């Protein structure tokens, strides 16, 4: 995907799927943020999950949505995401479910094929 303006919509959907997204303690949860970051990186910058650089503009948008003061917070947080995904089956199952739900919504809206 290339259209970064869709990321806030994806976050809204993510919140709907996860539930209770407006609560500060939920938004502040590291696992909550990591899973969202993983999904966005998988959609917009999959090479970042294999050690590459995050596509231009993605960090800034994620930082704004997730309440970071600087985009470097995103880089610091996503370091463990791939490890957790590969090593913890419950973590992986959560992400797989969330990713599938979001992709289905993107397809329904005609944003991807």
Where are these regions (language model features)?
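General nucleic-acid-binding
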Residues: 1-16, 107, 111
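Generic structural marker for isolated residues within well-ordered, non-membrane alpha-helices
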Residues: 14, 59-60
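Short, Lys/Arg-enriched N-terminal segment that forms or immediately precedes the first helix
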Residues: 14-28
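Short, amphipathic alpha-helical "recognition" segments used to contact nucleic acids or chromatin
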Residues: 30-57
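Generic structural signal for hydrophobic core residues of well-folded globular domains
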Residues: 40-45, 66, 81-82
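Short, basic interhelical loop/turn and adjoining N-cap
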Residues: 60-77
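DNA major-groove recognition helix of helix-turn-helix
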Residues: 77-85
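Short Lys/Arg-enriched helix C-cap and helix-to-coil transition segments
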Residues: 85-107
């Amino acid at each position: 995907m290339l259209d970064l303006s869709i990321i806030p919509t994806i976050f809204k959907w993510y919140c709907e799927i996860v539930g209770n997204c407006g609560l500060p303690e939920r938004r502040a949860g590291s696992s909550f943020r990591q899973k969202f970051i993983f999904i966005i990186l998988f959609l917009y910058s999959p090479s970042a999950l294999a050690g590459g650089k995050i596509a231009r503009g993605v960090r800034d948008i994620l930082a704004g949505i997730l309440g970071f003061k600087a985009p470097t917070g995103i880089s610091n947080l996503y370091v463990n995401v791939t490890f957790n995904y590969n090593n913890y089956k419950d973590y992986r199952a959560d992400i797989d479910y969330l990713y599938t739900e979001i992709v289905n919504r993107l397809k329904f809206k005609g944003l991807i094929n």
